[in-house]
């Protein structure tokens, strides 16, 4: 069995291509089933987000597994197989495990260290698990990856430092006010940066937000999309009297908020703090306003300094996380190597205990007068003899797991002890056959 990951992401394809190879949420369950029924696939998880579409699979052979996954993606999105090859990267074995760990912990994201991908990986795994397309390998590996990412985030605080301008704007407001939930905010502008700022404000717990814009229709549209208030730009002076936070991002060629405007409303604010954050170029807010008591005025250079410093912190945290990945890969490989041992040891124990049971039956027939206490003593000692006899063979079997020729030696081991144990590959194939029947039956039932 082999682990393979095929990824279409921000490094391998531009956004125009990525848009064409994203699964709709309501199509993912069927996609999991379709891929699972494909030749060579023993387990699979499909991850589809705005920045990446990835297939993780356990396959019986690397070259056939890779081909059938690429063919599956080509058919799903109306491309040729060669197109999928050109826009994707393929990772196999340890590289595939490393890729999953890096993706889950946010090291492979456009925004280094972001945590949203962890939830997306978890959702993808849970969907695959509930659909029936995961098995022994992925049920262990994905839980390991999720646990690793959680621990990495907690130990390094990699996601605590803002690395986008819009997010940094909200972080600056938090430095002044602490918690923002009860604060009033104004968003000036209705473009992409304004919307990102609005989303970050909502994410911080603020619900009292007003969007103002020179074109009222655009303000109304953005406000309706996120269920907040809107107003005309001419209402800004009145709104400023009660606002706590203002984030401005327009393409205006003159100042929208001036010193004079702030001086007029300052008298009515009763010394309440006001945070003005200007992320426009050219600037929307007149410089020098911060000289007024309790008025905090930040521009894009202030934000850039914070973003740059935070990015350096994230890069250091990412390096720390990266150093931990080899140990995780080793732990996974150790676990996988033991998979072949477990059935052999189980078969050996079962045979030994069957012999012990037969021996006890023989003793019962030949010595019918034994008391219950005597019988328990004999049973205990015969089991002890068996455990002592099995101790060295079991130790040897475990040591064989790391041998490059373990399959051949396990076969010899089974022949010596006259036992039969199914290898993980055979178990996975049987498991797949059973699950494919369940999927087919489920589809028939749904159709009816």
From Swiss-Prot:
Which is a GO BP term held by this UniProt record? protoporphyrinogen IX biosynthetic process
Active-site residues annotated for this sequence: 50
Catalytic activity annotated for this protein?
(S)-4-amino-5-oxopentanoate + tRNA(Glu) + NADP(+) = L-glutamyl-tRNA(Glu) + NADPH + H(+)
Question: Does the entry annotate any disulfide bonds, and if so which pairs?
Answer: none
- Location of site Important for activity? 99
InterPro entries recorded: 4pyrrol_synth_GluRdtase, 4pyrrol_synth_GluRdtase_dimer, 4pyrrol_synth_GluRdtase_N, GluRdtase_CS, GluRdtase_dimer_dom_sf, GluRdtase_N_sf, NAD(P)-bd_dom_sf, Shikm_DH/Glu-tRNA_Rdtase
Binding-site positions, substrate: 49-52, 109, 114-116, 120
The family database entries (CDD domains) matched by this protein are listed as: NAD_bind_Glutamyl_tRNA_reduct
Which EC number(s) does UniProt give?
1.2.1.70
Q: Does the keyword Nucleotide-binding apply?
A: no
The pathway where this protein functions is: Porphyrin-containing compound metabolism; protoporphyrin-IX biosynthesis; 5-aminolevulinate from L-glutamyl-tRNA(Glu): step 1/2
Question: Which HAMAP family does the record match to this protein?
Answer: Glu_tRNA_reductase
Give the function comment from the record. Catalyzes the NADPH-dependent reduction of glutamyl-tRNA(Glu) to glutamate 1-semialdehyde (GSA).
Q: What is known of its domains?
A: Possesses an unusual extended V-shaped dimeric structure with each monomer consisting of three distinct domains arranged along a curved 'spinal' alpha-helix. The N-terminal catalytic domain specifically recognizes the glutamate moiety of the substrate. The second domain is the NADPH-binding domain, and the third C-terminal domain is responsible for dimerization.
Its family remark reads: Belongs to the glutamyl-tRNA reductase family.
Assembly mode = Homodimer.
Q: What is this protein called?
A: Glutamyl-tRNA reductase
Species source reads: Staphylococcus aureus (strain MRSA252)
Report the gene name: hemA
């Amino acid at each position: 069995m082999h682990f393979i990951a095929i990824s279409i992401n921000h490094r391998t394809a531009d956004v125009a291509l990525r848009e064409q190879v994203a699964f709709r949420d309501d199509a993912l369950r069927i996609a999991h089933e379709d891929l699972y029924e494909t030749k060579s696939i023993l387990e699979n998880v499909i991850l589809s987000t705005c920045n990446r579409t990835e297939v993780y699979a356990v396959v019986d052979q690397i070259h056939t597994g890779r081909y059938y996954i690429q063919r599956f993606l080509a058919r799903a999105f109306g491309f040729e197989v060669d197109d999928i090859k050109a826009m994707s990267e393929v990772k196999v074995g340890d590289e595939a495990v490393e890729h999953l760990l890096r993706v889950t912990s946010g090291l492979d994201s456009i925004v280094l260290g972001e945590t949203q991908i962890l939830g997306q990986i978890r959702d993808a795994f849970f969907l695959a698990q509930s659909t029936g397309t995961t098995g022994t390998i992925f049920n262990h590996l994905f839980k390991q990856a999720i646990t690793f990412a959680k621990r990495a985030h907690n130990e390094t605080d990699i996601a605590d430092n803002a690395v986008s301008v819009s997010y940094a704007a909200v972080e600056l407001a938090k430095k002044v006010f602490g918690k923002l939930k009860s604060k009033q905010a104004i968003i000036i502008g209705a473009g992409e940066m304004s919307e990102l700022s609005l989303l970050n404000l909502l994410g911080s717990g603020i619900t009292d937000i007003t969007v103002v814009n020179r074109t009222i229709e655009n303000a109304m549209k953005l406000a309706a999309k996120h269920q907040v208030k809107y107003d005309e730009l001419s209402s800004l002076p009145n709104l400023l009297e009660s606002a706590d936070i203002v984030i401005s991002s327009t393409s205006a060629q003159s100042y929208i908020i001036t010193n004079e405007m702030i001086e007029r409303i300052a008298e009515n604010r009763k010394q309440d703090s006001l945070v003005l954050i200007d992320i426009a170029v050219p600037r929307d807010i007149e410089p020098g306003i911060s000289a007024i008591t309790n008025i905090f005025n930040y521009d894009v250079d202030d934000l850039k300094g914070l973003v740059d410093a935070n990015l350096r912190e994230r890069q250091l945290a990412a390096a720390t996380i990266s150093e931990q990945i080899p140990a995780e890969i080793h732990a996974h490989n150790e676990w996988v190597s033991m998979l072949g041992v477990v059935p052999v040891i189980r078969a050996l124990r079962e045979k030994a205990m069957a012999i012990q049971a037969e021996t006890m039956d023989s003793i019962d027939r030949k010595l019918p007068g034994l008391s219950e206490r005597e019988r328990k003593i004999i049973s205990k000692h015969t089991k002890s003899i068996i455990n002592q006899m099995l101790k060295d063979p079991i130790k040897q079997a475990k040591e064989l797991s790391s041998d490059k020729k373990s399959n051949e030696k396990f076969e010899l081991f089974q022949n010596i002890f006259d036992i039969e144990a199914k290898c993980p590959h055979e178990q996975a194939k049987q498991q797949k056959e059973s699950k494919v029947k369940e999927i087919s039956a489920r589809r028939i039932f749904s159709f009816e």
